[in-house]
Amino acid sequence: MNRLQLLSKGLRLIHKMSEEALAGVPLVHISPEGIFKYVMINVIDGGDASKAVIRGFADCTWHADIFDREEEVFKKLGLRAECPGGGRIEHNPDKKYLKVYGYSQGFGKADHAQTKRILATKYPDYTIETSDEGY
């Protein structure tokens, strides 16, 4: 094999690994209950593939804290991350209820309808409401 063939083979292997890493990223990771900030993150592999995921944690004061924490996780997997927006989530597991609302001052408002669709993949038996009201 010449150098070009070896390089091409190596790049295909890296691309396959990043595709597998992307496939392994959970769509939803949020706090088990309470009211907390969330961000939508577009996770991108080494090629053109990407997926939107939802992250929200009660222990994070700012939307940027959530993004920074998760971006480090994605970097270790060889993935890139972009944040198109955020908001807040009210999570009441006893009532099987989620409410998505508000916006991020730093990132802007996430697409709450898309957030609802993504949350429904993990919480199919929940009532999920969205609102453009509130901060």
Swiss-Prot record:
GO CC field: cytosol
GO terms under biological process: cell differentiation; sex differentiation
Similarity annotation: Belongs to the janus family.
Reported function: JanA and janB regulate somatic sex differentiation.
GO MF annotation: an example: protein histidine phosphatase activity
Record organism: Drosophila orena
Keywords: Differentiation, Sexual differentiation
Xref: Gene3D superfamilies: Janus/Ocnus
InterPro entries noted in UniProt: Janus, Janus_sf
Protein name, as recorded: Sex-regulated protein janus-A
Entry superkingdom: Eukaryota
SUPFAM superfamilies according to UniProt: PHP14-like (SSF143724)
PANTHER family noted in UniProt: BCDNA.GH02250-RELATED, JANUS-A/JANUS-B
Pfam family, one: Ocnus
Active site: 63 (proton acceptor)
Residues the record lists as binding substrate: 37, 104-106
